[in-house]
C-alpha cells in the first residue's frame, strides 16, 4: 500500500513540472577560439597627443554581427533547432573576455575596457537590449529566429548586432589578468603596428533547453564553463582584418567650435517634388598644430575629417536602399524616420564642401579604409584668434541641403537628424 501511494505521489509531482524539449545543434561550428570569430572592422587606429585627442575622444566605432566569422562565413547557416513551444526559453548570454587583461578584465570607466593598444579602451553594446558588455555574463531573450512548422531554427544572423566604440584614454591598466595567454599587458606606450595579442574582446553564447550556460550571472574573470563545448562565438580587434595602430604625438587637429544645430527654412511638399531644395550653412573651427597643412589628406599617416550619422539614421538609409556597397550614403535622414509620425518622410540632407564637392556620410559597418573621409583642411581658411603660439585656427564651411530622396514620396513634418564630426589619423 505504501509503495502504491508513493508511486502515485511521484507521478503527480513529476507531472507538475513543465516538460521542455532539448534544443539541438544542427551544423556545429566552433568560432569561439581566439582568432576564429568575427572582426570589429575598426581599421587603423591613430593616436595623437592629448591636446588634440582628450581622454574620451572617439577613435573608431562600428556595428557588427557575430556571423560572418572566420570559422563561419554563412550568416544563414542553421546553428540550433528548438521546439516552437520553447520560444520563451531562448537567450543570448554575453560578456567581455574577462580573464584577459587586454580582452575585457579592466573597466577604465563607463564600460570601456583596456585593450592591447596603449591608451585605448573599448566599449561593446548588445544593440537590441542596449546593455553594455561587462565582465558579468548577462542574458537577454533571443527573439529573432526562423519558424519551420513547429520548430525554431536559429542562424548566425539571428543574434543581435553589437556596437563597438574605441576611445582615447589618458592612462593604461597593466595589472595582470586571471590568465595571460601570451599577452602579459597592454603594448608599450609608443607601440605601432598590428593588434598582435591574440585575445578576443568578447563572447556571445546561445542558451536554451538542453543548452545550459552555467556561467550566466557569473564573472567572466574566472567563469567560462561553456567555452570547451565549442558554442562560444568570439569577436575582437585581433580577428582578421586585425586593427592596426599609428601614432603622431607632435601634430594634430581638434574641433574647437562648430554649428551644433543646422536650421533649415520651411519648404512646401510641392516645391520638393518639383526638385527644389533649401540650404543652410555648417561651419567648423579647427585648432591644429603648426604645419599640419602638410598632413591634411586621406592616406596613411594623414589627417582626415568625416561625418558619421547616428546608428539609427544609418539604419534608416540602409532600409531605404540609399547606401553604397561600402555602407556610405550621400543622404542623412531623421534618426527615427520610420517610427515618429511627426517626422517628414521622403526627405534627406546632403552635404558639400565650400568648393562644391559632395560629402558622403560614413558607414557603421566598417571603419576600415578611407572611403568617405575628406582631408582635414580641405578648403579651410586660416583665421586669427589662436591662443597658442604653436597652433593655428582654421575655418571650414559646408553647405547642408534639404532635398527629396530619390524614389520616395514626400510627406509633411519635421526633420531631426544627427551626425558626429570625427577627425582621424589615418
Positions of predicted regions on the chain:
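Sec-dependent N-terminal signal peptides
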Residues: 4-13
Amino acid at each position: 500500500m505504501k509503495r502504491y501511494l508513493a508511486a502515485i505521489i511521484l507521478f503527480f509531482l513529476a507531472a507538475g513540472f513543465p516538460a521542455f524539449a532539448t534544443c539541438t545543434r544542427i551544423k556545429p561550428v566552433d568560432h569561439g577560439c581566439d582568432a576564429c570569430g568575427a572582426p570589429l572592422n575598426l581599421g587603423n587606429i591613430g593616436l595623437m597627443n592629448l591636446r588634440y585627442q582628450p581622454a574620451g575622444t572617439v577613435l573608431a566605432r562600428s556595428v557588427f554581427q557575430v556571423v560572418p566569422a572566420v570559422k563561419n562565413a554563412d550568416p544563414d547557416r542553421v546553428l540550433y533547432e528548438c521546439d516552437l513551444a520553447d520560444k520563451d526559453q531562448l537567450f543570448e548570454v554575453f560578456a567581455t573576455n574577462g580573464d584577459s587583461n587586454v580582452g575585457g578584465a579592466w573597466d577604465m570607466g563607463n564600460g570601456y575596457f583596456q585593450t592591447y593598444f596603449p591608451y585605448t579602451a573599448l566599449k561593446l553594446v548588445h544593440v537590441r537590449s542596449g546593455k553594455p558588455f561587462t565582465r558579468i555574463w548577462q542574458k537577454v531573450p533571443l527573439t529573432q529566429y526562423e519558424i519551420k512548422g513547429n520548430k525554431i531554427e536559429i542562424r548566425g544572423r539571428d543574434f543581435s548586432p553589437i556596437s563597438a566604440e574605441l576611445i582615447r584614454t589618458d592612462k593604461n591598466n597593466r595589472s595582470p589578468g586571471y590568465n595571460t595567454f601570451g599577452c602579459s599587458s597592454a603594448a608599450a606606450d609608443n607601440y605601432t603596428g598590428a593588434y598582435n595579442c591574440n585575445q578576443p574582446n568578447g563572447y556571445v553564447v546561445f542558451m536554451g533547453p538542453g543548452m545550459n550556460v552555467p556561467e550566466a550571472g557569473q564573472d567572466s574573470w574566472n567563469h567560462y564553463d561553456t567555452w570547451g563545448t565549442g558554442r562560444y562565438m568570439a569577436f575582437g580587434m585581433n580577428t582578421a582584418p586585425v586593427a592596426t595602430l599609428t601614432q603622431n604625438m607632435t601634430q594634430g587637429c581638434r574641433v574647437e567650435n562648430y554649428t551644433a544645430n543646422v536650421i533649415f527654412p520651411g519648404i512646401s511638399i510641392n516645391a520638393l517634388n518639383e526638385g527644389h531644395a533649401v540650404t543652410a550653412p555648417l561651419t567648423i573651427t579647427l585648432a591644429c598644430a603648426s604645419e599640419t597643412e602638410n598632413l591634411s589628406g586621406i592616406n596613411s599617416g594623414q589627417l582626415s575629417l568625416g561625418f558619421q550619422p547616428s546608428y539609427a539614421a544609418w539604419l534608416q538609409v540602409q532600409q531605404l536602399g540609399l547606401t553604397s556597397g561600402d555602407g556610405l550614403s550621400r543622404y542623412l535622414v531623421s534618426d527615427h524616420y520610420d517610427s515618429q509620425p511627426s517626422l517628414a518622410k521622403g526627405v534627406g540632407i546632403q552635404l558639400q564642401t565650400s568648393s562644391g564637392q559632395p560629402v558622403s556620410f560614413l558607414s557603421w559597418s566598417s571603419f576600415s579604409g578611407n572611403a568617405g573621409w575628406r582631408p582635414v583642411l580641405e578648403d579651410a581658411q586660416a583665421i586669427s584668434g589662436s591662443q597658442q603660439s604653436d597652433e593655428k585656427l582654421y575655418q571650414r564651411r559646408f553647405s547642408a541641403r534639404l532635398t527629396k530622396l530619390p524614389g520616395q514620396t514626400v510627406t509633411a513634418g519635421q526633420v531631426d537628424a544627427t551626425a558626429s564630426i570625427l577627425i582621424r589619423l589615418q
